Amino acid sequence: SNIEYRLKDEKHYQEIVSKLKELKYSNLYYYNIPQVDYVDPKTGEVKPKDLQVEHWHHINENNAGMVSAIGFYMMLALQESGIQEPIAVVDCFKGGTSASVWIKETDLARDTDLKHAFLDKYHETIAGKSWEDFDRETKAYNLTVEKHNRDLAKYLKMHPDTSLSTAKNIVGHTPWPPPYRPDLYTRPSGLNETMLKQIEFGVFNQMVWYQGENDTDRAKYYDKLLPLLIHTWRQTLHDPSLPVKLIQLPGYANY
C-alpha cells in the first residue's frame, strides 16, 4: 500500500500540479499494470471485471494524480540528477500483499520451509471447500470490515482532533487478511501469475521493491523470501543482472 499510495493523496500534490502547468517535470511517463486478481483457467474470465485497458501516460497536470507517489519522486530525483532523456516508471503493485504472492509457485515449492509456511497452509485452508463456502466466508469478513469502518468513522466524528493512527489504536485496525479463496490475490504466487506476467517481455534498467508490514508475522522466513523474490523477477524479466533497490520499513509497531 505504500508503493500504491497515489500522488493525488500526497501532501505536495497541488504544488506538483502547479509546476506541471508551468511545463516543468517534462519527459516523465508512467504505466500502471492492471491489478488482475484472478484469471479463470477454464473461461479466461478476469477478476475484477471493471479493469481499464491501460496505456502509457505522459505525465501532466491532468493525469499525474494516478502515478505512484514514490515512483514519481524517484523519477523526479533521477531527472534532477541531470538525466535529460525520457524517464518512465512501470507501476506494478498491490497493497496488503506478502512477498510470497509475487514469487513463482515452483520456486516457493523448492524450499521446504517456504512450501510449508505458504503453499501448504493455503492448500490446507481451502481444502474441501465449495465456492458457496468461500462466498459465505467472504461475506462474513466483509460485514466485519464494514462494522469496523462504521466504528472508526463514528470515533473520528466524536474526536475530530484525533489522528487516524491513534483512532485505530483505540478502535482497532482494519481486519486483515481476508479469508483465503482460489480467486483472491493474496494467495501464494497469485500476483506473479496475474500481474508480473503482464510485463515479462519488458526491458528495465532497475527495479524498486518496497515491502511493508504484511510479512511481519512470518519474519523468520524473510531471509529466504527476499532473495527468492529477486531471483523470480530477474528470471521472469530475462535479466539476471537487473539492479534491485530495496526500500524497506525500518520497523513497524502500532504507534
What are these regions (language model features)?
Residues 1-255:
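Cell-envelope and extracellular/periplasmic
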